[in-house]
Amino acid sequence: MDFWTAFQAIILGVVEGLTEFLPISSTGHQIIVADLIGFGGERAMAFNIIIQLAAILAVVWEFRRKILDVVFGLKSQPAARRFTANLLLAFMPAVVLGVLFADLIHEYLFNPITVATALVIGGVIMLWAERRTHSVAVDHVDDMRWSHALKIGFVQCLAMIPGTSRSGSTIIGGLLFGLSRKAATEFSFFLAMPTMVGAAVYSGYKYRDLFQPSDLPVFAIGFVTSFIFAMIAVRGLLKFIANHSYAAFAWYRIAFGLLILATWQFGWVDWSTAHG
């Protein structure tokens, strides 16, 4: 492994860790950054699975007490059973639609132009959602109804379009459906666990032949980097939302998306030939 390859692994690990749980689209950033630094091909597909697992492991570690409380409370606590049922219900739409359409979406939509467009549209929707007046019916994730979970699960499917953002769609969906900002954010984190693990297992099995022993050092660097920065992002976001709205992320999405579209429109970067 040469220095440049190690540097690429660090950069992409940082990008994955920082963006996976922020409402700015980790997939979109990965596609754009990977294209800029020339990290692609079969190794990149396997590498992305590894760094996504690292990011979700950071969330599991951060919420380990809540997870253990739910696991040990399944037999005796109705709240734990309801929370688990809500997670499974919210997870199912992504399973069905992911299996049916994942290959088509990857083939036709995994490119920087789609990402940039989705970033802008998602940013505008995020601003609208934050500025509208909405009542809070659910203050805590344990108080969610099955209907809340199912609706958030369907909204999560929008994130199959790169640039939309899984966390962004579920958080904003939660706000629109009556969840508090804290409840919507926490449920988004918890929903990420089965969703991302399921996607990683599916992709890992599908592309199992791409994992080569010679790539272990690159994978290790990306894994550790992604884990560390995902932990920073999760803790930072939970503190941020206590006193702030998501407007800053919305403006970032719009500005970043417009920048990508401008570089393409004026011919500074030929994004149209790029593919994730």
From Swiss-Prot:
It catalyses: di-trans,octa-cis-undecaprenyl diphosphate + H2O = di-trans,octa-cis-undecaprenyl phosphate + phosphate + H(+). It comes from Pseudomonas putida (strain W619). It is a multi-pass membrane protein. Belongs to the UppP family. Its EC number is 3.6.1.27. Bacitracin is thought to be involved in the inhibition of peptidoglycan synthesis by sequestering undecaprenyl diphosphate, thereby reducing the pool of lipid carrier available. It is an enzyme of class 3 (hydrolase). InterPro entries: UppP (IPR003824). One of its GO terms (cellular component) is plasma membrane. The gene is uppP. GO terms for biological process: cell wall organization; peptidoglycan biosynthetic process; regulation of cell shape; response to antibiotic. Catalyzes the dephosphorylation of undecaprenyl diphosphate (UPP). Confers resistance to bacitracin. One of its GO terms (molecular function) is undecaprenyl-diphosphatase activity. This is Undecaprenyl-diphosphatase. It is found in: Cell inner membrane. Keywords: Antibiotic resistance, Cell inner membrane, Cell membrane, Cell shape, Cell wall biogenesis/degradation, Hydrolase, Membrane, Peptidoglycan synthesis, Transmembrane, Transmembrane helix. The chain crosses the membrane at residues 43-63, 85-105, 109-129, 183-203, 214-234, 249-269. Pfam families: BacA (PF02673).
